[in-house]
Amino acid sequence: MNVNAKRDNSRIKEIEIMDCTLRDGEQTNGVSFLPHEKLMIARMLLHDINVDRIEVASARVSEGEKDAVARICRYAKTIGKLDSVEVLGFVDNNKSVDWIAECGGHVINLLAKGSYKHCTQQLKMSPEEHLAHIKQTIDYALSKGFTVNLYLEDWSSGMRDSRDYLFMMMDELVKLPIKRFLLPDTLGILNPLQCVEYMRQMVRRYPNSHFDFHAHNDYDLAVSNSLAAVLSGAKGLHVTVNGLGERCGNCLLYTSDAADE
């Protein structure tokens, strides 16, 4: 993709592109952006490349991150794209929501657990307890005027190993005013055939929901899996500049051009 040329959004009617360079991309070993660098990259992504959405940070990481998010939100507001700026937040007694609000943002990508193992072993909660905490956080975010998207962390493992748990959670979550469900292959375990199978099951079971797919490149399949997800009903793709990201990286930004086709 030519980074100096704006993406032609007229070619994509349904597929949203969310660039995660400033959040997941910064988890690349040895990569760290200063606040002014984050603002510069955000300007490029929102204005020059014209991606639909950007995820710019994880809440409550540092004062430097808070400064960067505030700068990006101020800029995005001046060009009418504040709704395109998203921040990863946590189920943490509303601290993430307040942090994002203090930065001037109002879109939270709330991190919930998409596998029984993550729920019971990481959080040491029952699914019912986790669900209650999620609902409370969403209620609070909505009271502050937020748009809420929801990550189902470890979704791919959940579909493979604990589908009953995942569907029980989704059956309740779809009743809430969640705008998008973000489905990550957190450990990078999927191949394209599994991606097709799992995404189709989600789309068929929850036909009125918007699903994003978030790939990891551990087996060099992030691009293939992302395209498989789109062909199977995903309405959003998560990408990063040059495939930056945790461990082996994420789906490449210029893959969105292939998705256009």
Regions found by a protein language model. Give the residues of each.
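Conserved small/polar residues in nucleotide/adenosyl-binding loops
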Residues: 254-261
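Catalytic cores and adjacent flexible loops of soluble metabolic enzymes
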Residues: 1-253
